[in-house]
Amino acid sequence: NNEVHYPLLSVFKFHVALAVLDKMNREEIPLKHIVHVKASQLQPNTYSPLRQKHSGQDLDIPLGELLQYSISLSDNNACDILIEYAGGIGHIHQYIRKLGINDFNLSETEDSMHRNPQKAYANWSTPSEMVRLLKMADEKDLFAPVYRDFLWKTMTETATGSNKLKGLLPSNTVVGHKTGSSDRNLKGVKMADNDAGVVIMPGGKKYYIAVFVTDSS
């Protein structure tokens, strides 16, 4: 089923992180670099531990911490703040395409998908292209080791999807992954139930995997 355009949902936060880290790498910006976030950027009625902690107030936060919120906690507001920092969703799409990844599309932010849930179908990838991107990010020198190591450490700390890729694996298996899922609509259909990442087995064997399920009932 690799020809299907699977909606990524929050898996696209991995693509966003790559573009952000590329900008930081090119401009030699440290992970502890502080960015100012306005209270108006912390949208209500969306999943956001960041907003729960800082509701109604401006804040200054390190870029590295914003990335942790977006990847490990799948914070939607943190993701959109990072999209803006990276230059917009169109720039992120072009960055990923320049890496040689073709069977995907990114055109929507978390806010635009929240306003019109059908737009979530516009952010899509094939499973094999997602695996290619994961492998490339792990094996190629896309940016300095300090950024690369931070990304994979953050992915191993993902708090969502303990019943997905990690499900029945031995407890000492290392899994660096990004999940993505939707609620079921009124007809009981779930747009997406996804998990993609790198798995390092206790014996040291490594593999990359993307599991995408769409429109399940």
Please identify what each model-predicted range represents:
Residues 42-81, 89:
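Conserved catalytic neighborhood of penicillin-recognizing serine enzymes
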Residues 22-45, 89, 144-148:
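Short, well-structured active-site flanking segments
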Residues 2, 62-66, 73-79, 110-118, ...:
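Flexible glycine/proline-enriched surface loops and loop-helix/loop-strand junctions
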Residues 59, 80-142:
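Mid-domain, small-residue-enriched loop/turn segments at the edges of structured enzyme/sensor domains
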Residues 9, 69, 81, 103-107, ...:
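Structural recognition of the beta-strand scaffold that forms the well-ordered cores
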Residues 3, 9-11, 15, 30-32, ...:
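Extracytoplasmic
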Residues 7-35, 70, 209:
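Active-site SXXK
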Residues 4, 84-85, 89-90, 132, ...:
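Structured C-terminal helix/loop/strand segments within mature extracytoplasmic catalytic/sensor domains
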